[in-house]
Design a protein with these regions (language model features):
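A conserved short helix/loop substructure at the end of the activation segment
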Residues: 183-194
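Conserved structural core of kinase catalytic domains
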Residues: 17-51
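Conserved catalytic-loop aspartate of Hanks-type protein kinases
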Residues: 131
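Catalytic-loop of the protein kinase fold
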Residues: 69-86
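Conserved activation segment of eukaryotic-like protein kinases, specifically the C-terminal portion
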Residues: 106-120
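Conserved C-terminal C-lobe helix
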Residues: 171-185
């Protein structure tokens, strides 16, 4: 486990996930285990009549949380819906098992295919922009209350590289420019950092 002391904030980056029930049987982890409380998913069930301001705020806080990690010099590497958690009304980003330094990425493709940016299927390294693409998929599935479907790694590659077509419910069309910037298939056309996405969201809110 790496502990970062930056900006008076402690970030714990665990690199091994173990079952809670086995902790007592593994003395080598004594004093080095991070126990997470039971939490709710940040991106929960969404009603199309839900207040747009509340939706905007949830998206904004998720972007800010990801920006904090990037500013510390890390790529999350496995952004997915389940890793944004709500605890005591606060947002937490969890599960840093696949986190990589921005300055020294590696070519290992160990992300979840549902959320993989197109370039990762072609062997590219994970980047800030692949994190952004994954967040775009999270937001797309949340706003549409649907799940993308594929039956194999190859089908996921075809979906992300060729077939993905972003269409939002009429009540959430205001967020289409944000999702378009997050989900561009060509990396050079995607938002280059989280702050570009935040600025886009702010413009949509004015």
């Amino acid at each position: 486990m790496k502990i970062l002391h930056i900006k008076k904030t402690n970030w714990l980056l665990p690199f091994k996930i173990i079952e809670g029930s086995t902790v007592s049987q593994q003395p080598q982890f004594q004093g080095r285990v991070l126990v997470l409380p039971d939490t709710d998913c940040w991106f929960d069930v969404l009603d199309q009549k839900q207040n747009l301001k509340n939706i905007d705020e949830k998206i904004y806080l998720a972007l800010v949380k990801l920006a904090e990690l990037h500013e510390l010099g890390w790529i999350h590497g496995d952004i997915k819906k389940e890793h944004f958690r709500k605890f005591k009304q606060e947002l937490y980003l969890i599960d840093f098992e696949k986190t990589r330094l921005i300055s020294s990425p590696d070519p290992i493709t160990d992300a979840t295919p549902r959320y993989m940016a197109p370039e990762l299927f072609h062997g590219a390294n994970k980047t800030v922009q692949s994190d952004l693409y994954a967040l775009g998929i999270v937001l797309y599935e949340w706003l549409t209350q649907t799940r993308l479907q594929a039956n194999s790694y190859h089908e996921w590659a075809v979906l992300h590289c060729q077939k993905l077509n972003v269409v939002l419910p009429s009540s959430f069309q205001v967020f289409l420019p944000l999702l378009s910037g997050l989900l561009q298939k060509q990396q050079q056309n995607r938002f280059s950092n989280v702050h570009e996405a935040i600025n886009c969201l702010k413009m949509l809110s004015t």
